[in-house]
Amino acid sequence: MKFIIKSISKNSGRLGQLRIKDSKELQTPLLLQTTKGGSIPYLSADVFGMVTQEQQVLQLTLCTMDQMAESLAQWNRSLGAYVGYPEYNTLLLLRDPCEATPTGGNDRDVVPLFTRRGKESLTAERYLQLVSSFAPDVYQGLCDADTNPESTKKRVQKSVDRTERFMEHCYKQHRELDRLKDSTLLAPIVGGYNTYARTQSIKHAREQPKGSYGGYIFEGFHTNGLPATRLSPSQLLPIVEHCVQQIEEELPRLMPGPLTPVLMLELIRLGIDIFDTSYAYCAAVNYKALTFSYTIDKEEHSAFLDVTDEAIREEFKPMLEGCKCLACQKHTRAYVHHLYKTNELLGPILLMIHNLHHYMGFFDVIRQSIAMDQLSLLLDYVRRQNMPNDVNYCIEPNTKVVGKAAMGKGFITAAN
């Protein structure tokens, strides 16, 4: 994996080019496509091809794909080809950023992997065995990331010490396993909200021989899912800034999870390069269409459109005026509300199409703003949306959500 910084600004973050293996050059800040079990949620490859024709990177998760390891070990093509996207690169994470990860289950030599089949305790040896079966283009090192803003100093220190032990094995095996010889390892930086612990984690990574890893992944700030949308910038940003000052500029930095648009912009300004679409997914499964504006104007805008709201049942206009996505071009708010009322599968499909299109457009504007050194202007606009007060981008669980047990049935009530 090759990463080149094109421009850098104190107030606007940095623009870069990322090339994974022999793929096309990817522009950073980069948005990874979050997947569930190897598939982009609700969308077939053909439908996703109508959302975008641009080169993408799939963010796959071991906790939703571990059952595929045996067959993948016999697969002689790329991981992207296995999941139906042969032209896309792949990045493998341990945990699903869309779902809150249960706490506990950590031990001296194991990390819990929560799957649909229950909990599996992963040793570093077992983890590398699974990763080598997948042979992704990029993967994260094994880490204890079970920390959040409420974690005690003792829990934080244990997460750092365990991660160091796991990574000693990962660095060694990464160099020796044949199926990982073309893969890039991301070094995890853990330590909760403790600057001393974060410094210790960074120091351990930087002590490794040059070329041992190709980038950083920041873990341990949250436990994924909707709680990540409620992170406090005043707590998070000083820790991230502290970390960024201690790591090499020439390596890319990844921050997974459903972070709010405002927090993403703040992190980009600090120098984080890679994010994912889990926020768009979390909004969709809670019946919310993204409607915040990133094209500066003088009108007031809201963060979401709640398609369960009875007030839109006779609104025969797009979910977002002026949106060019397939859903908004062909369907109305009233129709999407009708799909929710009748539990039709097309409902979440249309929401996912719209939210992904909107979020990818948001990142296009982010890159343009950085190029013009105007990210601060975009940040102020997205934060207020011409409203008297800051807009709330936190995603609260809807009383009616898409039930996991019957995802193929479309919208269903929690009671079902």
Curated annotation (Swiss-Prot):
GO terms for molecular function: metal ion binding; tRNA-guanosine(34) queuine transglycosylase activity. Its main location: cytoplasm. Keywords: Cytoplasm, Metal-binding, tRNA processing, Zinc. Its cofactor is Zn(2+). InterPro entries: QTRTD1, Queuine_tRNA-ribosyltrfase, TGT-like_sf, tRNA_ribo_trans-like. GO terms for cellular component: cytoplasm. Binds 1 zinc ion per subunit. Heterodimer of a catalytic subunit and an accessory subunit. This is Queuine tRNA-ribosyltransferase accessory subunit 2. The lineage of its organism: Eukaryota, Metazoa, Ecdysozoa, Arthropoda, Hexapoda.
